[in-house]
């Protein structure tokens, strides 16, 4: 910076020492040199901002003490990522090869967040949103040592539009994985989201963690764009059905939740058996949970296709079946209290 100031001072002195005619002729040259110095200054400023952001992210991670580990339930236990795992996850993100079928929820109650991630993977715009949010980070030795993750959320100021950069080099041992049981991009997003909340993986109410929540907020936290809810209380009108159909057939992420549906619709200890059609054409009953969130995969005049963040469903016998299923509109409006429609740009 001192060199740039000295250079500008020298340019000023040289220019002021010229006669008026030479000043007029030489002005473009001096302007070009001044612009070059300004570009260098702007570059230094951006580098300083980047270094400050990285420093803050690393400090935030270092100061984050995961709740729920010392008390013995272990829900917040974290597992470090090896360089090989980081490279594999980064390769998946860079390729854009992401699908809602990549996601299997395990011991953390963040179905609302995972359903929103699943919904983003459906469109190129949604996948780009994920790619833009996760950037691999390299250590001094040139090897990948984690990810810088942008989270559009500030739990201390929930009504304000804010974002933070979080450094992630570990994931929840009881958190989301791919079908192969290995961590993936969803694991990175989940880890960053938990790091943003004082309660980590604990309950979202009394502990201010990420277990329990609503798809609307999660969708906004992932996209930095507004989301709207279509209420199913009293059923979905023809216009509301059309709105959901149009959204499900667009690039926008769409999710649905059962938590706000009438409790009497889930008479079996918070569960209900519902007739559905699986992707292979098999008709069966699957168990729906009364406090769960799902991705809306598709919708048309005949019904709605959904995907369970668990990665599978259970039929009435307990048999595991495909995580994706199609149900009638009549059943959808009975069991799903609201539908969240997000936006990606």
Describe the function of each predicted region.
Residues 36-37, 41, 48, 56, ...:
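Generic hydrophobic, helix-prone segments enriched in Leu/Val/Ile
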Residues 1-89:
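Intrinsically disordered, low-complexity charged segments of secreted bacterial virulence
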Residues 1, 13-17, 142, 270-272, ...:
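Acidic, glycine-anchored loop motifs typical of Ca2+
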């Amino acid at each position: 910076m001192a060199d740039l100031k000295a250079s500008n001072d020298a340019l000023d002195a040289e220019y002021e020492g010229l006669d008026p005619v030479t000043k007029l002729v030489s002005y473009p040259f001096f302007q070009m040199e001044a612009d070059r110095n300004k570009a260098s200054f702007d570059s230094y400023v951006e580098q300083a901002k980047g270094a400050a952001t990285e420093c803050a992210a690393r400090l935030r991670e270092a100061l984050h003490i995961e709740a729920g580990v010392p008390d013995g339930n272990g829900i917040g236990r974290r597992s470090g990522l090896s360089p090989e795992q980081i490279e594999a996850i980064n390769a998946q993100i860079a390729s854009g090869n992401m699908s809602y079928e990549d996601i299997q929820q395990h011991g953390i109650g963040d179905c609302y967040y995972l359903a929103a991630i699943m919904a983003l993977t459906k469109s190129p715009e949604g996948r780009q949103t994920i790619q833009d949010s996760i950037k691999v980070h390299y250590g001094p030795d040139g090897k990948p040592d984690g990810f810088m993750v942008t989270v559009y959320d500030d739990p201390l100021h929930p009504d304000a539009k804010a974002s933070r950069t979080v450094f992630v080099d570990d994931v929840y041992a009881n958190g989301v994985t791919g079908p192969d049981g290995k961590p993936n991009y969803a694991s990175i997003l989940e880890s960053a989201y938990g790091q943003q909340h004082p309660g980590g993986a604990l309950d979202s109410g009394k502990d201010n963690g990420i277990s329990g929540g609503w798809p609307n907020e999660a969708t906004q936290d992932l996209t930095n764009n507004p989301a709207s809810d279509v209420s199913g209380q009293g059923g979905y009108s023809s216009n509301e059905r059309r709105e959901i159909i149009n959204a499900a057939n667009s690039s926008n992420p769409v999710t649905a939740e059962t938590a706000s549906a009438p409790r009497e619709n889930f008479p079996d200890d918070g569960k209900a058996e519902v007739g559905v059609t699986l992707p292979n054409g098999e008709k069966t009953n699957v168990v729906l949970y009364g406090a769960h969130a799902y991705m809306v995969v598709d919708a048309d005049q005949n019904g709605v296709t959904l995907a369970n963040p668990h990665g599978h469903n259970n039929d009435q016998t307990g048999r595991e079946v495909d995580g994706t299923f199609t149900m009638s509109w009549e059943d959808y409006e009975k069991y799903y209290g609201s539908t969240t429609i997000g936006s990606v740009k």
